[in-house]
Amino acid sequence: MFGAVGAALYAVLGLFSFLIPGTQSVAVRPAFALVPFFGKRFGVITGFFVGLVGNVIIDLISGYGLLYWNWSVANGLIGALAALIFTAIPPIAGEAVRLVVTAIGALAATAAGLLFVITDMWVQQGVDFSTFFYVNYLPALLANGIAVVILVPALDAAWEPLAKRAGL
């Protein structure tokens, strides 16, 4: 259930984005922060589902279709990796430290998951390693990295008291 809610939120809010000039359709998408957040809070399957399905819906609505399917898989991997990273980290009592660790973990999941888009070298014609790295990966990491470092800790700080009250 949380996966469907997360994917729907990501799909709707993800439409509010803008393309970075000089890249191959890399967009600044603040809603992307929902992917590692749902991974952290609800687990591997939910994180993967939110990233994959949410990104597929965004691409379909935006008119890209399934042309960039590998980016959807990368988004799913980011949600799953966030879940794995935060599962490996023991509970942190201090609020400030927990939020810093949340930002670092979300950024690490984003950096690792986006590496899957190296498949652009085989999926799209004319993409070599240099193009992948400088035109696709780094701009996406920068845009999404800023979003996750700021918004995932903010979402987590807002969610923590609600989760405790609800017994989650």
Region spans (language model):
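Hydrophobic transmembrane alpha-helices
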Residues: 1-41, 45-46, 79-87, 152, 156, ...
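Membrane-embedded alpha-helical hairpins and interfacial helices in multi-pass inner-membrane proteins
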Residues: 18-29, 63-70, 90-168
